[in-house]
């Protein structure tokens, strides 16, 4: 896990002052904020023309002192960083900057399915059948890969994404379908305790396997 100093004033990113240096990344804007963390659009690369856009998923500083939460965050990273499939947004790095843990994730230039469905409702139309079939096919391919993926000594990840819901499925402007956010998932490699009687995800989209 990489560690670095950010070189920016403490709390600057939370005041909406962008761009903001964060380790070797430059945060361009905040995309969302929840009770556990924030999502930023960022770029990496110092040479003009060789910059790359990424997504930075950063947990809130006050949660860094919660050992159980950090263990689960690292579990997520250890699982997600092993996945390399065309239909899964790739995790490039897990690290810590000035005590703030983060993931650097592939940026998908497109729209999530929730936004596509909302646009269809507003316009009184439906998603084309061929697009629905494409999304379903590619989702199945990505999930099957994650479930059968093996690591050292042939151990299977046996990974189940517990929240395959419209916000967690991206469709790029080039027609690629990508699964994002394996943060709510069950894997054979997780070390943090989990209660088998507790289900994770959105009720209408919970994985039946859990």
Feature-to-residue mapping (PLM):
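Conserved ATP-binding/catalytic core of the eukaryotic-like protein kinase fold
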Residues: 2-210
């Amino acid at each position: 896990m990489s560690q670095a100093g950010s070189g920016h004033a403490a709390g600057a990113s939370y005041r909406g002052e962008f761009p903001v240096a964060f380790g070797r990344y430059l945060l361009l804007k905040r995309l969302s904020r929840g009770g556990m963390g924030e999502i930023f659009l960022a770029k990496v690369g110092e040479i003009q023309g060789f910059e790359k856009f990424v997504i930075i998923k950063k947990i809130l500083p006050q949660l860094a002192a919660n050992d159980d939460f950090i263990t689960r965050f690292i579990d997520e990273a250890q699982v997600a960083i092993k996945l390399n499939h065309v239909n899964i947004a790739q995790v490039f790095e897990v690290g810590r900057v000035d005590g703030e843990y983060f993931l650097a994730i592939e940026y998908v230039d497109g729209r999530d399915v929730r936004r596509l469905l909302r646009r269809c409702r507003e316009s009184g139309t439906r998603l084309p059948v061929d697009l629905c079939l494409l999304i379903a096919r590619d989702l199945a391919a990505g999930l099957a890969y994650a479930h059968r993926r093996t690591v050292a000594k042939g151990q299977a990840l046996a990974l189940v994404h517990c929240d395959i819901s419209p916000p967690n499925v991206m469709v790029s402007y080039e027609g690629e379908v990508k699964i994002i956010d394996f943060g709510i998932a069950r894997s054979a490699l997780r070390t943090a305790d989990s209660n088998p009687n507790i289900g994770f995800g959105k009720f209408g989209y919970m994985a039946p396997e859990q």
